[in-house]
Each structure stands twice: as C-alpha cells, then as structure tokens.
Amino acid sequence: MSQLETRTEPMVVNFGPHHPSMHGVLRLVVTLDGEDVIDCEPVIGYLHRGMEKIAENRTNVMFVPYVSRMDYAAGMFYEAIVVNAPERLANISIPKRASYIRVLMLELNRIANHLLWLGPFLADVGAQTPFFYIFREREMIYDLWEAATGQRLINNNFFRIGGVACDLPWGWLEKCKDFCDWFGPKIDEYEKLITNNPIFRRRIEGLGSISKEKAINWSLSGPMLRASGVPWDLRKVDHYECYDDFDWNIAIAEEGDCYARYRVRIEEMRQSLRILRQACEMIPGGPTENLEASRIAEGKNSPFAGFDFQYVAKKVAPTFKIPNGELYTRLESGKGEIGVFIQGNNDVTPWRFKIRAADLNNLQILPHILKGAKVADIMAILGSIDVIMGSVDR
C-alpha cells in the first residue's frame, strides 16, 4: 500500500475579490508555504470608473457631487481638494467664516472615517462588539451633515470654489458641541474595551511592522506614516485652511506595527475633538442665528456684513474658466495625503485632472509587510492600512 507524500510545493490561494474582509473589490493572489506567506500580489482595478476623465469633461460645480463616490468614508475631503485646486490656480481668497465651516466638516469626516475603520478592523481580528458601537456615534455625525448639507453619507455637495454652498443652520454649532461632549467619553470607553485588552494586543502587536525609513521610501502618509515615528501632518506642514488658529498636536507612535496604527487613529479622534470644540467657539460671527441678528440690528454698514463673515467669497458662475497654469495641491484626509494635480487651459473644464489617493500609495507596501506573516494575519495587516477600493481604483 503506497503512502501519500506530504505536499511540499507552494500553494497559490486567491483572497477576494468577493471576500468579507477585502474592503471592497480587492483581490490578493497569495503564495503560501504551509501557513507562511511567501509572496502576495494585489490585483486592483475592479472599481475603476474613469473619475479623472469625467473630471476633465465637467465644470467644477458639476464634478463636486461625483467625488464622494470615490471614497464614501472621506467624501468631504475629496470635495475640499476638488475645489481647493482651482481656487489656488485662480488666486481666489475665501472668507474666514467659510474656512472655519470647512474645518468643522473635515474634522467630523476625519472622526467618521476612523470610526468606520475601527469597527471592521476589530471585526477582522475577532472583536465584534465595537462594530455596533461605532455606528451609534457615526449616526450623530450623519445627523449633523444632514442638517447642514441635506445629505448624510455621500453626495453632500457642500464645498464650492470660494467657500461653501450655504451657511450653517440655526442651532447647528450647539448640536456640534453636544456631539463633542458625548463623543469624548465614548473614546475612553473604546480604550477601556480595546487598548489594553490582552487578547487584542497579543493578536496584533508586532504585526506588519514598518520602519521609519521604509515608510518614507514608500511614500506612505497619514496614520501609516505617523505610526512609524514620522511627525508629518499636512495640517501643520502646509498651513491650509485655518488650522493654525487652533491648539492641537500631531498623533504619533514609534513601533510601526498594527497596534501603533490603531493608537494613532484613536489619538487623532481626540485631537479632532479639540479642533471641533475650538472651531465652534472661535468661528467668526458665532452661531448663524446670532450673526443674522447682529446684521439686522446694525443695518447695512454692520461689520458683520464684511468679507470674513460670509460663507462664500463670490458665487462662481457655471461659466467660470480655470485659468492657464498647473499646480499640485494636497490635504490631510483620514487615510493620509490626497492631492490633485490640475492643469488649466482657460476653459470651463480642466485640461488635466490627476487625483492622488492616499490609500493607493499605502496599499503598495502590503506585499512587503505580508512576507513571512501567517495566513491568519493577512486580514489584520490589510485592515490596519485602511483602504477603500473606490479611491484606489478611481
């Protein structure tokens, strides 16, 4: 009777594109030696919709509603970068109040982004409970967005060249402060449940380690870069919008592993709360109801009718032409640096519109940090990167 020989050659396994932990339609062709990963080839492009070419055939006002479909967890960030590029190319100034409103929306989006990362990441490593908690807090952010823009998750269509589409509704700032007061203790609750949980720490500490040099060489950004000990945050580096008005710190860790990336994102939510609280207190003109009352009481020559108290500099006409020239502009999203290279041709549509997605660059290092890992660790490492395939493929 012949004995079956042990199989010794490597095995090739497909993870995805239809896999519950693939965060969209990502396919990983993984080569295994037993339970050890010896190679990994990500296959992307399943969600490519030609967003850049669409942008080159639309006016800016027409294109803004499209962009939140690239990354449904970072719609406000993409709206911001899409209007920032022609603003800078045309040297358009925006009112201080409009800048504060933008910061409020961006920081709410940063918290929503990290919450939507936290729940599925913990579900991937076996902790189901926080997945239900994070949606409780996200609902409050959706309610704030719905009150201000009319939409909840995507298609907010709120950012405009020169400012925003409309001023904040009455009572919105108070509701935002209520959210900050509610959410602060909830982060403490997450930390008690997760941060020092021995099972969670043993599951992800030391996984997917990236050194400071490797993080820089691979052009990583956002929490992926800061978790490796690089204090690089575009809100501090580029001084865009009005972030210099606020007192906040860059969230940073040194270890470069999955646990460090978790800690950076938790701390970023705390820092976003600090910015939100300060913005609610310092916004020029204060709450909309007070601002409108002051304008009415003081008449036509009221200082509150000045430029910095408006929500938009000047409403851009549908025939607004993007001037000749080219530039690259960027901002710090929840996932890292997103940017737009725009080339104008004195036409209503841009001649070239290149989008840099943060998660595409961050995803490129995945094969290198998976080598030597176990099969069970693939989803934990991929989850710690935080990718949304809509913006990877565009």
From Swiss-Prot:
Which GO BP annotation is one of this protein's?
A: photosynthesis, light reaction
Coiled coil spans:
none
Q: Which terms are listed as keywords in the entry?
A: Membrane, NAD, NADP, Plastoquinone, Quinone, Thylakoid, Translocase, Transport
Enzyme class, UniProt record, top EC level: translocase
> Which family is it part of?
Belongs to the complex I 49 kDa subunit family.
The record describes the protein's role as: NDH-1 shuttles electrons from an unknown electron donor, via FMN and iron-sulfur (Fe-S) centers, to quinones in the respiratory and/or the photosynthetic chain. The immediate electron acceptor for the enzyme in this species is believed to be plastoquinone. Couples the redox reaction to proton translocation, and thus conserves the redox energy in a proton gradient. Cyanobacterial NDH-1 also plays a role in inorganic carbon-concentration.
The record's HAMAP family line, in alphabetical order, gives: NDH1_NuoD
Q: Protein name, please?
A: NAD(P)H-quinone oxidoreductase subunit H
